[in-house]
Amino acid sequence: MAKNRKTPDMNLPMWFDGQNINEALFCEEFLQERRIIFANGAFFTPDGRVTDDLPLRGEIYDKLKFCAVNNIPRKITNILEVLKLEAQVSDFPPEQDRIHVANGTLLLNGTFTEGRPAIVRSRLPVGYNPDAPAPVIWLNFLDGLLYAEDIPTLQEFIGYCLIPSNKGQRMMVIKGNGGEGKSQIGAVLSTIFGTNMKDGSIGKISENRFARADLEHILLCVDDDMRMEALRQTNYVKSIVTAQGKMDLERKGKQSYQGWMFARLLAFSNGDLQALYDRSDGFYRRQLVLTTKEKPVGRADDPDLAEKMKAEAEGIFLWAFEGLQRLVANNFKFTESDRIRENREAVKRDNNNIFDFIDSEGYIQRKADASISSKDFYEIYRMWCEENSLAPLKARSFSDAMIANAKKFNLEHCNNITNSAGRRVWGFMGVEAIARPHINGFYGDSPCTYVPEDIPEEWRQVE
């Protein structure tokens, strides 16, 4: 064995000549004693990814402390850099068909293998115990927090987060008015996921191009108190939710690289996740929006509830695994109640008032053989917004939103519409104007001041 290799003249390891340490020989011996690899910018062991290298430095120090060499901390740093080269493998793909837990490996078909012989990407701190009691406190908590038909969706989503896969292509937002206890879910999940879960901010992910790299190797990112501001850009968030394989990641001051991304996003909020400019169906389609029940008046909250539920971790894991198996059997299509679908539609409508405008009466009507120019269509829309005290979209945003939803509204966007001046312009087939802003009274700034006729004569006199 390498650990018994000694110099012929002194009772010293081969990597130490009495004065100097040979880092390459040290790493060669270290790797024969320790199962560890370096891939995708991180060390991995049978315990999963090394998130804190202090214990690793401690192991190296234990081997070096008998050596009378100067500046051991710097020497340890040098050894770690050499170890990255010595232990490097070209790639370490995630295993999507199994869950590595504290006491072994659980396959999606329910087969369990005890022991931890292999180096793995991630290992959950919870153990697999098929005889674990049902998590009664957890289930009672969910029953008081969520509507019964929405609980299976949460069960499937938590189970979905157990494996490194984004095949479901969904994120989850749990919305309430505050005080319901929804953030207790995050505290319980931290016991199940350990270092494979990260507290983060969806707002930061959307704004900061470096934030995605912080989610590399992570199974679940929890935003415990999502900001209410609408996202200025959504491409970073959407790319994480739909990532299937490697994606371009960037860290500050370093060149971008291709890294594995399979982090799922879970947010708790008092409002909806909205986009400032993105009104595409794709942004909202990827959200599972659960609403909480109202907090009962006079309910006494248990300050130790989270700790009690954490004690049921093994049972909660079995409950989540059941949800994962159901999701996989359904080809990664989540169970969605009518309420969840209505929530998603409401979020979309709140952020894009063209849906309410299209359904309004007295302004337009959908008619197969009718047409309207884009300019007139927008002017009627502005009129509707002003009369309903709503902020109108800009002309380009309105047109883009109408084009994106043309099929849903049975409209056709084309450039052979004839306007009132007889010129051919862009517009829409399938809709007819009822209200005409330039005819039906004042719209926008009035061109003159209206003076009633029944005012006293002396008020009309000018000094």
Question: What are the language-model segments listed below?
Answer:
Residues 32, 77, 193-195, 200-209, ...:
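Positively charged interface segments
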Residues 310-352:
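Phosphate-handling catalytic cores of nucleic-acid transaction enzymes
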